[in-house]
């Protein structure tokens, strides 16, 4: 018993940190949507795989279809990317989804994700919406994604000092 007590006391002096990593896939594949990367408009490629330090993230809590034409609550952890990542000349095309909805044929909407590193945790989520007022160093997350990264939830408001990297999913 004394050994166990001493062991616990010794462990309490050791620095401990825990980290987690989660990667969420897009709701649909290009095969399911019939969108083609080769025919899509492109404004995001110049930003891919370039970490942005000192970034911030916020959250939104509304449903519906986002700027890509996809349901913004599917998957439940997702992101709205900066309006500067979207090509204003991108065309809306009919998809192969069962409801034949129109989708934005823009690379930012086709298997593109944002990876956020914050307080030792890493979350990678698909971009399925646009945050017009956000700069490239600001990502607007679904509430569930925000809460996964920031345990303080909505009381934090704007989470700061994140590293943001736009990547292929």
Task: Label each region the model flagged.
Residues 16-169:
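Secreted/periplasmic proteins
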